[in-house]
Design a protein with these regions (language model features):
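Generic surface-pattern signal
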Residues: 8-17, 87, 144
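Conserved phosphate-coupling serine/threonine residues in phosphotransfer and NTP-handling enzymes
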Residues: 44-46
Length: 147
């Protein structure tokens, strides 16, 4: 087993053992957005097993219509995978993320973007964002300002 597989297996085990946490307010905000009629699509650079364990542990299927993982697309850049998402789910988009990879989607496709300043990214990665939020509970209002 290569190092990446070992790390993934350990991360999946820890999530399954209850060692992972969502940011405070995440489930309430996701439910609020879903109830408001927004279609939520998940796109991540994470490994598929890691994503699936989060789905199972936190019941993310309750909120998201679909899940896309870069591993399933040969680790193509998110902005390329997004083309597939647009075909599968036509409509308007607001890109929400905590890393420059997320903001690249918005930049390359001419879409509004919200940077999550409470996530893993650094402030210098957020230069293309229309909005920067410091807490997920700010998300509904930020989306409202962009749509």
């Amino acid at each position: 087993m290569d190092a990446s597989a070992v790390v993934t297996a350990e991360m999946v085990r820890r999530i399954a053992d209850g060692q992972a946490r969502l940011f405070p307010g995440t489930e309430e905000i996701l439910q609020q957005l879903k109830n408001a009629g927004y279609r939520l699509i998940f796109l991540s650079n994470c490994k598929t097993a890691y994503m699936k364990q989060h789905q199972a542990t936190f019941g993310l299927d309750r909120y998201f219509e679909d899940f896309y993982c870069s591993e399933d697309y040969g680790y193509a850049p998110k902005y390329e995978i997004f083309i597939r998402i647009q075909k599968d789910y036509p409509g308007s988009y607001v890109i929400i993320g905590d890393r420059f990879h997320d903001l690249q989607i918005a930049e390359k496709h001419g879409l509004p973007a919200i940077a999550c300043g409470y996530g893993y990214g650094r402030e210098d990665e957020f230069c293309g964002a229309n909005e920067i939020i410091k807490d997920i509970r700010e998300l509904p209002e930020a989306i409202g300002r962009l749509l």
